[in-house]
A protein has these predicted regions:
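Intrinsically disordered, low-complexity Pro/Gly/Ser/Thr-rich segments with frequent PxxP/GP/PP motifs
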Residues: 114-151
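Asparagine-centered strand-capping/turn motif at beta-strand->loop junctions
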Residues: 95-102
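Post-signal peptide N-terminal segment of mature Sec-exported envelope proteins
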Residues: 41-64
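Short, solvent-exposed loop/turn segments enriched in Ser/Thr/Gly
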Residues: 86-92
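Terminal connector regions
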Residues: 42-49, 143-192
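C-terminal motif of bacterial Sec signal peptides marking the signal peptidase cleavage site
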Residues: 28-32
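N-terminal secretory signal peptides that target proteins for export/translocation
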Residues: 1-15
Length: 192
């Protein structure tokens, strides 16, 4: 093979290699920019995707042994660099029954915006949370109604003395080349 024919062959091989590489790498790069699948309209309803949660009818004269309200800070949007630039976040509020033997009942899980206005009631009826079980409540990234000062208030009760549940929020954004995630922990705000 002469030097001239190898010089002509090299650009042809390089072009084929680059075309193949582009076909393999481009879809991977583009999928990294994907904002995620469209959310299911029922994704925030625990009954639709957390079948272990059972609705409970509490009698009007129900007297719990323990009851608390937990405030959980949530960030639907955060500022970066200045107040004109924001990142929208998906949030999952997880309420975990830490008691090894006894159930707790979640009476209310409410989502409030930065202005303090109620945005959503996540429960239509109280739900039972078995020992060591968890209940998750999702605010999709596309729901920015809560703003930078959003929060949840979780009201729970128990029939007997129990270990207090743990309530946390996990906020995540993966919509660009950089991802961000952080956690905030709930705090008891009311104990009758």
């Amino acid at each position: 093979m002469s030097m001239q024919s190898s010089d002509r062959l090299l650009p042809l091989v390089s072009q084929k290699f680059l075309a193949t590489l582009l076909l393999l790498v481009l879809p991977a790069l583009l999928s990294g920019c994907e904002e995620g699948a469209a959310p299911d309209k029922d994704e925030a309803k625990p009954q639709a995707w957390q079948l272990h949660l059972k609705e409970v009818k509490l009698p009007a004269n129900y007297k719990p042994a323990v009851q608390e309200s937990i405030y959980v800070p949530v960030y639907a949007t955060i500022y970066y660099e200045n107040k004109g630039r924001t990142i929208d976040l998906a949030a999952t509020v997880s309420v975990r029954n830490t008691d090894l033997k006894n159930r707790i009942i979640l009476k209310k899980v409410d989502y409030y915006g930065t202005d303090g206005k109620l945005l959503k009631n996540y429960l239509t009826e109280p739900v039972e949370l078995d020992p060591m079980a968890a209940a998750d409540f999702v605010v999709p990234r596309t729901d920015v109604s809560g703003g930078t000062g959003a929060n949840f208030v979780v009201d729970w009760v128990a029939d007997t003395d129990v270990s207090a549940p743990l309530a946390e929020a996990v906020m995540v954004s993966t919509g660009s080349s950089q991802s961000i995630s952080f956690v905030s922990r709930g705090q008891v705000i009311k104990q009758p």
